[in-house]
């Protein structure tokens, strides 16, 4: 029987394998991150461009044998999951080389799943049902955490767009008010001159 303390330690270990980061990538620059895993381990990359330019970035995932696993150009956000095809270090790169002057801020998470169990370990059919439920709960909690982080990023982006639009509307309204006042003063001056009696001496 598994005790509550063991379950909490297992849950903490499962949640510890997920890390969310913000990274700033300058124009004409590339940032790479590395994860060493064993063959068969499930990995995932979730990313979203939070700030900068057209909110796009180039993404590339490369295996230990320099084999391209995933390549995406000018993506704003994405989610990619795969199983490691061999033991070694996997490379996750974000490139801002297409940008001429705007740095980008990228929020990303690299998920590393459990390593596959060997022949000497007990099979899935004999696993404890409670352990399976905890694994499912950990995965669900991680997914909720990711969604909350990405919703915060999206909310920040939309708030910036709303603030920008609001300031433009206020400036345009102020400009229209000035034009209206100028036209009113011009019409008053014109009508006053129209009804003026000119005396000839």
From Swiss-Prot:
Region feature Interaction with F2RL1, mapped onto this chain: 1-181
InterPro entries in the record: Emp24-like, GOLD_dom, GOLD_dom_sf
Spans traversing the lipid bilayer: 169-189
Further comment: Ectopic expression of TMED2 alone does not result in its proper cis-Golgi network localization. Coexpression of TMED10 is necessary, and coexpression of TMED3 and/or TMED9 is facilitating localization. Down-regulation of TMED10 expression reduces TMED2 protein level.
Coiled coil: 117-167
Bilayer disposition of the protein: Single-pass type I membrane protein
Cellular component GO terms held in the UniProt record: COPI-coated vesicle; COPI-coated vesicle membrane; COPII-coated ER to Golgi transport vesicle; endoplasmic reticulum; endoplasmic reticulum membrane; endoplasmic reticulum-Golgi intermediate compartment; endoplasmic reticulum-Golgi intermediate compartment membrane; ER to Golgi transport vesicle membrane
Chief site of localization: membrane
Residue ranges of the motif COPI vesicle coat-binding: 194-201
Name listed for the protein in its UniProt record: Transmembrane emp24 domain-containing protein 2
Assembly behavior: Monomer and homodimer in the endoplasmic reticulum, endoplasmic reticulum-Golgi intermediate compartment and Golgi. Probably oligomerizes with other members of the EMP24/GP25L family such as TMED7, TMED9 and TMED10. Interacts (via GOLD domain) with TMED10 (via GOLD domain). Associates with the COPI vesicle coat (coatomer); TMED10:TMED2 heterotetramers are proposed to be involved in coatomer association. Interacts (via C-terminus) with COPG1; the interaction involves dimeric TMED2. Interacts with SEC23A; indicative for an association of TMED2 with the COPII vesicle coat.
Keyword tRNA processing: no
Protein function: Involved in vesicular protein trafficking. Mainly functions in the early secretory pathway but also in post-Golgi membranes. Thought to act as cargo receptor at the lumenal side for incorporation of secretory cargo molecules into transport vesicles and to be involved in vesicle coat formation at the cytoplasmic side.
Assigned keywords, A-Z: Coiled coil, Cytoplasmic vesicle, Endoplasmic reticulum, ER-Golgi transport, Golgi apparatus, Membrane, Protein transport, Signal, Transmembrane, Transmembrane helix, Transport
Cell compartment(s), UniProt: Cytoplasmic vesicle membrane; Cytoplasmic vesicle, COPI-coated vesicle membrane; Golgi apparatus, cis-Golgi network membrane; Golgi apparatus, Golgi stack membrane
Organism, as annotated: Homo sapiens
